[in-house]
From Swiss-Prot:
The gene is ai2a. Its EC number is 3.1.-.-. Keywords: Endonuclease, Hydrolase, Intron homing, Mitochondrion, Nuclease. The expression of ai2a in E.coli causes growth inhibition and degradation of genomic DNA. It is found in: Mitochondrion. This is Intron-encoded DNA endonuclease ai2a. It is an enzyme of class 3 (hydrolase). Its main location: mitochondrion. GO terms for molecular function: DNA endonuclease activity. One of its GO terms (biological process) is intron homing. Mitochondrial DNA endonuclease involved in intron homing. Cleaves only one strand of intronless DNA sequence at the site which coincides with the I-SceII cleavage recognition site. The lineage of its organism: Eukaryota, Amoebozoa, Evosea, Eumycetozoa, Dictyostelia. Belongs to the LAGLIDADG endonuclease family.
Length: 309
């Protein structure tokens, strides 16, 4: 009996930890891409606007809180929850985790409306899943083959937002904005050193991202540094370019195929359910991966022929 009790206690602890991580991730996602509103008739709403390729995030939210998913533009989808049961559940999940100054004002108003005590968030650290949700919403990792440099990018209207949200303090570094064309369409690039990148890599392995392309890029970070070290010893520019080109295809594979905005947009016009659209998305990804695999096989055959010659 004691063994069974211990197992049950362990399961409960694991469930509590995983639910806490998920709540922190959700708060980060809302801070980056969400908005709380209170209508004149006294109904609370939460809207979260993401790119079409991140529809799986919305489906996960719909399964937990109800609500609806609608296409906003060609490449954007909106999740909305407004029913009382879903809103109350959501308040319980994110209370004590909301950090964005505007979201805090909106969320306080919602809490007051439903007579819920508002909780202030704790200091942001690497032992918190908030950053993964915020990164899913507005974060990017870019790289420059010319400088062999990785950049952290955020879609911010204000360059001071990293300080306001304590992200710099959490990372333990002072991020400096790139001067030459650093802001383009409200995307700001920040130079990051290898130590910070690898600590982010470890963090995102513990607090996983839900965005497919960002997850792919995070997993490719060690390979980036492998190629960086390899190209230092190579003098032939053509060989260097070839290595970076192959890596570039892996890094931006979803962008190059462009199945998200074009093919999935057509499915939104029909009355198919979100679950069916995700199945179609998986099929499209499978065909994409097959093309990549066949391309890799052709490259290997070419290399073998070159060696024999």
């Amino acid at each position: 009996m004691k063994k069974e009790e211990k197992k049950e206690n362990k399961k409960r602890e694991q469930n509590q930890i995983s639910s806490k991580k998920w709540n922190e991730w959700l708060a980060g996602l809302i801070d980056g891409a969400g908005k709380f509103t209170l209508s004149k008739s006294g109904y609370a709403n939460l809207d979260i606007l993401l790119e079409l390729r991140d529809e799986k995030c919305h489906i996960e939210l719909k399964q937990r809180f109800g609500g609806e998913i609608k296409r906003k533009e060609t490449t954007l989808i909106r999740y909305r929850v407004h029913r009382l049961y879903g809103i109350r559940q959501l308040i319980a999940c994110v209370n004590g985790h909301i950090r964005h100054p505007l979201r805090k004002i909106e969320f306080k108003e919602i809490c007051m409306h439903y007579n819920v005590e508002y909780k202030e968030p704790e200091t942001l650290t690497f032992a918190n899943g908030w950053l993964s949700g915020y990164f899913d919403a507005v974060g990017l990792i870019e790289f420059s083959t010319e400088q062999d440099q990785l950049y952290l990018a955020f879609r911010h209207k204000k360059n001071t937002m990293l300080n306001e949200l304590e992200i710099q303090k959490c990372l333990g570094v002072n991020l400096t904005c790139e001067q030459n064309g650093c802001s383009c369409e409200s995307v700001t690039l920040y130079k990051i050193n290898k130590k910070t990148v690898l600590s982010l890599y470890k963090y995102f392995k513990k607090y996983r991202l839900r965005s497919s392309i960002k997850t792919t890029q995070i997993l490719l970070i060690p390979q980036f540094y492998e190629i960086q070290n390899e190209t230092k010893e190579i003098n032939d520019m053509q060989v260097k370019q070839k290595l970076w080109k192959q890596f570039f295809k892996k890094w931006y594979v979803d962008e190059m195929v462009k199945y998200e905005s074009v093919k999935l947009a057509n499915y939104y016009k029909s009355k198919t359910s979100p679950e069916k659209r995700v199945k179609k998305l998986i099929k499209l990804k499978f065909h994409r991966n097959e093309r990549i695999r066949k391309r890799a096989e052709r490259l290997e055959l070419q290399k073998e022929k070159e060696k024999k010659a």
